[in-house]
């Protein structure tokens, strides 16, 4: 039986010049867990992911188990709409770089429901949701068992956002993946996360959603009363015949 954590972070500190972004952060993540990273803007959520990927310098210890195979989906990639590259070619580039068999691309695109029409389309012409799915497919090539997501639904419409989160939940369930997810959506965090890691200018905190997502904790974290965005699925389950609410509350 495996007992050691997949990820262990000890006394992590990150500074940019004289500004401390993360100070003395320690936490662990185990196989199959979904860890949501929350906090106000500027708290260091994206910085933490970049440090976990060893893309930026840091002080302290970040230890990945030898079992960990990482995939990463950034918050945003700017693509020239005139770029003569199809979604399929974009994915094949990684396939060839990793020397993977062609069947893996077929398996991943089938699992994510990527159609031939989408795969053959110029990557610069895709909608936000379509491009996000392609980025997830890109991350899944190579059989990772850990996925790091930096606000995977930023700037997406409500329905597309819901579908992306359903997809992430399916990946965690069906593949027993460990997921580290930066999100401002407290509704998604409360429903899907096993653990919540709070980053703020004060002392970081970590625990299950019921322990962390309390009015008192969120008031301290955000210095404002928390608001939850009620998703389509939640609203329809409670009110099958009612109109979908249009207010979007987030922290």
Give the residues covered by each predicted segment.
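Conserved ABC ATPase signature
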Residues: 122-126
């Amino acid at each position: 039986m495996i007992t050691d954590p997949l990820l262990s972070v000890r006394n992590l500190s990150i500074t940019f010049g004289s500004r401390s972004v993360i100070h003395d952060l320690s936490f662990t993540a185990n196989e199959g867990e979904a860890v949501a990273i929350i906090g106000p803007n500027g708290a260091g959520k994206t910085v933490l992911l970049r440090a976990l990927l060893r893309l930026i310098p840091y002080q302290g210890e970040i230890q990945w188990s030898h079992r960990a195979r990482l995939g990463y989906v950034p918050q945003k990639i700017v693509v020239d709409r005139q770029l003569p590259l199809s979604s399929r070619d974009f994915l094949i580039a990684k396939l060839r770089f990793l020397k993977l068999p062609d069947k893996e691309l077929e398996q991943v695109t089938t699992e994510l429901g990527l159609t031939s029409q989408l795969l053959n389309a110029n990557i610069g012409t895709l909608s936000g949701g379509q491009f996000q799915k392609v980025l997830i497919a890109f991350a899944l090539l190579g059989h990772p068992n850990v996925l790091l997501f930096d606000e995977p639904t930023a700037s997406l419409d409500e329905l597309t956002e819901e579908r992306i989160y359903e997809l992430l939940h399916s990946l965690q369930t069906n593949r027993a993946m460990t997921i580290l997810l930066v999100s401002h959506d407290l509704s998604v965090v409360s429903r899907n996360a096993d653990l919540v890691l709070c980053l703020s200018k004060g002392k970081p905190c970590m625990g299950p959603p019921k322990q962390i997502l309390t009015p008192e904790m969120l008031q301290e974290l955000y210095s404002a009363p928390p608001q939850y965005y009620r998703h389509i699925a939640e609203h329809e389950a409670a009110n099958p015949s009612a109109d979908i609410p249009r207010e979007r509350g987030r922290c």
